[in-house]
């Protein structure tokens, strides 16, 4: 039978309806200096409910599995107790002792973010040294930092495994903590085998065949696994990395209904652990928990008007509130590059009078981009730049959808559909974080509205965005018309004028036109890649490719074949023509 944890005084004081617990960080047992720093310098007045449950468990030394909604403070839930325990260690931790805590994250941007939080946490404990290693960075410089010693190491799996295999100066015999942050994302990115190899190297795999190889005492190593969603891959990772773990947030609805504490300790029987995890996975897949303060909307637009309406909504947002941060999610890297160019460079005349010389930027704020094909330096600049701005737009692929906590993001626009409902949850999780208000907007074509039913099945309910009202608020040719007949969005004067401006901008330069063509081709390829039941909703056969081209500011539909393919196709047709037997001319008979 699974052993139950008694309900702590802290848990009794929790505000069950809200995000925050009614206790303080001091009540959780953290060092007074660390608590004062959290409140005075980092601005954390009270722990979230997840932090109130996880921090005491993390300090107890037990393995832990945490399932919590995005934006609930999972990073602090493991970093704060690690810093607390390290600063108390006697004799004092030195750099030559090597690495004590390892945090594994899925992306480079999340690596930088966790490193930044760790830096702030150890500010008053100067002998603790955080550091990071990740793909794209200079390996020799990382090797030098590892040689000097890093107390708290944040890493992406691929680069960590590389150093474990090839960097002899990497000192980790004292490693006490291994943290899997955003574990579901790590596994979805294909790092499952790398994680198993890492656990083998560090002697933390729960295989009986490896017990004799493990030189460390089993009780000295504590593994923590944190995830916003659960699936079979996460289940397997938990089975091989966690031993008798404390479970947090996995069965809140069930436990509350029975009046039981939802934090429980499992038995040593791995089959029982697996069975318990499977039950939890089935429950978790059916429903996703989203912040109550998140306003979710959808906008239904025809394909050809998508770009003009995106620009209109962004302009409306920034005119409504000057200090605004927005993340726009797109499906491909090429699409990100194209839309970044349009948003940052498109100029227009007041009232969209194209014949006037007085022009200004359509979007006045800074625009950043983020995707996996960018150079590491450019990715870092974009991530840090957008984080530091008070008013900005970030256009990004799903590389920014997991774990990243951009300050003060008020709106998420899913311009391209996320596909799986779990991805929708991760995207909208970039706003309405830690109790703050936020809004999320999903673009859908008329042929895609069945996707709303799929989201409803997973607990996400969206209302329609008042697009007509927003369009009518903009003047055309310097005049604001007060009475307008109900017309289709495609024929709206504002949309028609803006579409002409977009097509003029895109076709004015060859470089911009090439960006648009590449974005068009990659978008169509991505649209065909939807899996399972979603293929019935997102059917490429139902698309009008001419209208898709229009959504990239193109007047004509580009060929979906590359230039080399076109040349080969023409060559093949010529060869086939030559190989055909020549037709005999019919000579009319003489009469």
From Swiss-Prot:
Catalytic activity: ATP + H2O = ADP + phosphate + H(+)
Chain intervals for the UniProt region annotation (Disordered): 562-591
Biased composition annotated in UniProt, kind: Basic residues: 568-591
Known EC number: 3.6.4.13
Chain positions recorded as ATP binding sites: 68-75
Tissues in which the protein is found: Expressed in flowers and pollen grains.
GO terms under biological process: ribosome biogenesis
Motif stretch (Q motif): 23-52
Segments passing through the bilayer: none
InterPro entries attached to this UniProt entry: DEAD/DEAH_box_helicase_dom (IPR011545), Helicase_ATP-bd (IPR014001), Helicase_C-like (IPR001650), P-loop_NTPase (IPR027417), RNA_helicase_DEAD_Q_motif (IPR014014), SPB4-like_CTE (IPR025313)
Ranges of residues in domain Helicase C-terminal: 293-482
Subcellular location(s) per record: Nucleus
Induction entry: Induced by auxin (NAA), abscisic acid (ABA) and jasmonate (JA).
Motif (DEAD box): 181-184
PROSITE patterns: HELICASE_ATP_BIND_1 (PS51192), HELICASE_CTER (PS51194), Q_MOTIF (PS51195)
Primary location recorded for the protein, binned into one broad class: nucleus
UniProt KW keywords: ATP-binding, Helicase, Hydrolase, Nucleotide-binding, Nucleus, Ribosome biogenesis, RNA-binding
UniProt cross-references to CDD domains, sorted A to Z: DEADc_DDX31, SF2_C_DEAD
A GO MF term: ATP hydrolysis activity
GO cellular component: nucleus
A family per Pfam: Helicase_C
Biological function: May play a role in organellar ribosome biogenesis and suppress 16S rRNA maturation.
Domain commentary: The Q motif is unique to and characteristic of the DEAD box family of RNA helicases and controls ATP binding and hydrolysis.
Family as reported in the entry's similarity comment: Belongs to the DEAD box helicase family. DDX31/DBP7 subfamily.
PANTHER family, sorted: RNA HELICASE
Protein known as: DEAD-box ATP-dependent RNA helicase 17
Organism: Oryza sativa subsp. japonica
């Amino acid at each position: 039978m699974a052993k139950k944890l008694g309900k702590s005084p802290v848990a009794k004081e929790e505000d069950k309806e809200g995000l925050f617990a009614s206790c303080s960080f001091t009540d959780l047992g953290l060092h007074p200096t660390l608590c004062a720093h959290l409140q005075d310098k980092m601005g954390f007045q009270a722990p979230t409910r997840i932090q109130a449950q996880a921090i005491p468990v993390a300090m107890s030394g037990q393995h832990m599995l945490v399932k919590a909604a995005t934006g609930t403070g999972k990073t602090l839930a493991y970093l704060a107790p690690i810093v607390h325990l390290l600063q108390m260690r006697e004799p004092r931790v030195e750099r030559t002792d090597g690495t004590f805590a390892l945090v594994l994250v899925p992306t480079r941007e999340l690596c930088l973010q966790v490193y930044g939080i760790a830096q702030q946490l150890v500010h008053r404990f100067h002998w603790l040294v955080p550091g990071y290693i990740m793909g794209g960075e200079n390996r020799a410089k990382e090797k030098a930092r590892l040689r000097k010693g890093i107390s708290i190491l944040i890493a992406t799996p691929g680069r960590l495994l590389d150093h474990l295999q090839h960097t002899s100066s990497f000192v980790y015999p004292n490693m006490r903590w291994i943290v899997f942050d955003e574990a579901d994302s790590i596994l979805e990115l294909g790092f499952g085998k790398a994680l198993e190899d890492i656990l083998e190297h560090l002697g933390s795999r729960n295989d009986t065949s490896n017990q004799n190889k493990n030189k460390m005492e089993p009780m000295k190593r504590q593994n923590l696994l944190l995830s916003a969603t659960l699936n079979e891959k996460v289940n397997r990772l938990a089975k091989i990395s966690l031993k008798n773990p404390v479970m947090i947030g996995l069965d809140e609805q069930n436990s509350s209904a029975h009046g039981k504490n939802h934090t429980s300790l499992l038995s040593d029987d791995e089959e029982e652990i697996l069975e318990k995890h499977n039950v939890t996975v089935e429950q978790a897949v059916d429903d996703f928990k989203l912040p109550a303060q998140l306003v979710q909307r959808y906008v239904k637009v025809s394909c050809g008007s998508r770009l003009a309406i995106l620009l209109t909504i962004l302009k409306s947002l920034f005119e409504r509130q000057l200090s605004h941060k927005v993340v726009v999610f797109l499906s491909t890297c090429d699409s990100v590059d194209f839309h970044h160019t349009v948003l940052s460079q498109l100029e227009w005349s007041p009232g969209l009078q194209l014949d006037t010389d007085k022009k200004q930027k359509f979007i006045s704020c800074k625009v950043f981009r983020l995707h996996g094909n960018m150079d590491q330096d450019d990715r870092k600049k974009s991530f840090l730049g957008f984080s530091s701005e008070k008013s900005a737009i970030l256009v990004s692929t799903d590389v920014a959808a997991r774990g990243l906590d951009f300050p003060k993001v008020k709106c998420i626009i899913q311009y391209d559909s996320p596909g799986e409902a779990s991805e929708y949850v991760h995207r909208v999780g970039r706003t309405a974080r830690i109790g703050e208000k936020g809004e999320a907007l999903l673009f859908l074509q008329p042929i895609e509205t069945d996707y709303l039913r799929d989201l409803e099945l997973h607990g996400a309910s969206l209302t329609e965005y008042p697009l007509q009202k927003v369009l009518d608020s903009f003047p055309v040719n310097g005049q604001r018309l007060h009475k307008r007949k109900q017309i289709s969005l495609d024929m709206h004067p504002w949309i028609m004028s803006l579409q002409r401006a977009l097509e003029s901008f895109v076709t004015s330069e060859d470089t911009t036109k090439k960006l648009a063509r590449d974005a068009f081709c990659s978008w169509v390829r991505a649209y065909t890649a939807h899996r399972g039941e979603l293929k019935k909703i997102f059917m490429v056969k139902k698309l009008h490719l001419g209208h898709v081209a229009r959504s990239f500011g193109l007047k004509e539909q580009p060929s979906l074949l590359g230039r080399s393919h076109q040349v080969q196709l023409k060559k093949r047709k010529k060869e086939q023509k030559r190989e055909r037997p020549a037709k005999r001319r019919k000579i009319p008979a003489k009469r």
